[in-house]
Amino acid sequence: MVVLAAAIVVKSGKVIVSRHYVDMSRIRIEGLLAAFPKLVGMGKQHTYIETENVRYVYQPIEALFLLLVTTKQSNILEDLATLTLLSKLVPEYSMSLDEEGISRASFELIFAFDEVISLGHKESVTVAQVKQYCEMESHEEKLHKLVMQSKINDTKDVMKRKANEIDKSKIEKNKPGGFSSMGSMGSGRLESGFNELSISSGGGGGYGSGSGFGMISDVDPINTKPKDRSRSSVTAPPKSSGMKLGKSGKNQLMESLKAEGEDVIEDVKPTGQSKAAAPPPTDPFTLTVEEKLNVALRRDGGLSSFDMQGTLSLQILNQEDGFVQVQIATGENPEILFKTHPNINRDMFNNENILGLKRPDQPFPTGQGGDGVGLLRWRMQRADESMVPLTINCWPSVSGNETYVSLEYEASSMFDLTNVIISVPLPALREAPSVRQCDGEWRYDPRNSVLEWSILLIDNSNRSGSMEFVVPPVDSSVFFPISVQFAATSTYSGLKVTGMIPLRGGGGATPRFVQRTQLIAQNYQVI
């Protein structure tokens, strides 16, 4: 068996991919392949055609021909086995069996052909082995990546411990002095009980007994940066008139990153007018009602999954104000299941809708970071699409050398959505897509190849909208999954704080408090 060449040609005779395995000139290969389409129409066989010098063994693949050019002395049965193996490999490396798809995967196909045929002879391999050889996976490379990831995780743990130590030192500094030892011990014991039963807002949900419920905050150790030593107040050296190579090089780097679509935050010296960090709470009590949505919509319509998790947290400014109870009102939604913190009096909540500690002589802990102490949480899971606040429809269609994509959104009347961002993944493009129509604003991220559709506010004036853009021809699966971000000031539960009940002092007056309510899309996709 001697295979002279393996090729993929169109029925008109145009060669897309060709690989020859013997010493043969390009003119001869092109002549043999150019003569093949004329012989197909004349011959009566459907698997091979013989000429005076060579034999063509071929197989149709939609509008193409997979072709082996062999000598006449070659074993026809082995040639057919080789052709069958190659026909199984072609769909593995080409998404579409047309001229453009084969051209895009031409190098991968040549590498796969080389694994099957060596010096004109068939190798004893399978499709799985060929894919493994072409992937060229390295055990040492995987081990190196695991070691690097382990180092990164260790560094994050160290940064997290440092951040916790800094937070604890700040709390210790802010604690007022003069308390008796018994009072300090009691407060510390209760505060530790809340901390030990804290819940992470990014976890995998569920009301199992293993998850606690306390301080609701995610401390990102990466954002806790030490003070830049280069900005300390030292005597500035005298200015020189020499060339400032470092400055110009830095500016060029910044400009190049901006040209590639990267968001660059320039390192500037702080001034008195620069934006400061978020101010600390000034009100005695701050209550936060937050609901997070995790929704997966099907691209052909319907709901795949719906999960809403809500929390109510309390942040107290002063230690002496911790002897309080919280009066709430819940909406009439029987599908929402409420669960209190273990230190909260469950019977009082069920009978009077009041959140108070089991031990009224102990205050709520103060000095908690983030949103404060978690008091209540709830959850709702539905399979009804009518509860979804926003649905997205994506309609891609290929016409000639272009793919027309039509996007539509429909918003429910239950919520007014703000800061809506619909992110559509795109194939790798040399330039931004051609946007024909857009209700709102759009932005193309070339680094991540994502088209972002932004709507500042969705209310009764624009419950529906559309966007149309054009890209080169691609498979429709490229545009999924579509990610959606938004926020709202109303919630599914309708939970509201109606008042604060002081247990000590206050003269019966209702303490002043601030309530913050928000609904956010944590993981909202069209798959």
From Swiss-Prot:
Domain of life where this protein originates: Eukaryota
Family matches, as SUPFAM superfamilies: Second domain of Mu2 adaptin subunit (ap50) of ap2 adaptor, SNARE-like
Regions annotated as coiled coil: none
Record region (Disordered): 166-187, 217-250
Gene3D superfamilies: 3.30.450.60, Mu homology domain, subdomain B (2.60.40.1170)
GO terms under biological process: protein transport; retrograde vesicle-mediated transport, Golgi to endoplasmic reticulum
Compartments it resides in: Cytoplasm; Golgi apparatus membrane; Cytoplasmic vesicle, COPI-coated vesicle membrane
UniProt xrefs under InterPro entries: AP2_Mu_C_sf (IPR036168), Coatomer_dsu (IPR027059), Longin-like_dom_sf (IPR011012), MHD (IPR028565)
GO cellular component: COPI vesicle coat; Golgi membrane; plasma membrane; plasmodesma
Low complexity bias locations: 177-187, 239-250
Alphabetic keyword roster: Cytoplasm, Cytoplasmic vesicle, ER-Golgi transport, Golgi apparatus, Membrane, Protein transport, Transport
Biased composition annotated in UniProt, kind: Basic and acidic residues: 166-175
Domain MHD: 282-527
Bilayer topology annotation: Peripheral membrane protein
Family membership: Belongs to the adaptor complexes medium subunit family. Delta-COP subfamily.
Biological role stated in the UniProt entry: The coatomer is a cytosolic protein complex that binds to dilysine motifs and reversibly associates with Golgi non-clathrin-coated vesicles, which further mediate biosynthetic protein transport from the ER, via the Golgi up to the trans Golgi network. Coatomer complex is required for budding from Golgi membranes, and is essential for the retrograde Golgi-to-ER transport of dilysine-tagged proteins.
Quaternary context: Oligomeric complex that consists of at least the alpha, beta, beta', gamma, delta, epsilon and zeta subunits.
Stated name of the protein: Coatomer subunit delta
Organism expressing this protein natively: Arabidopsis thaliana
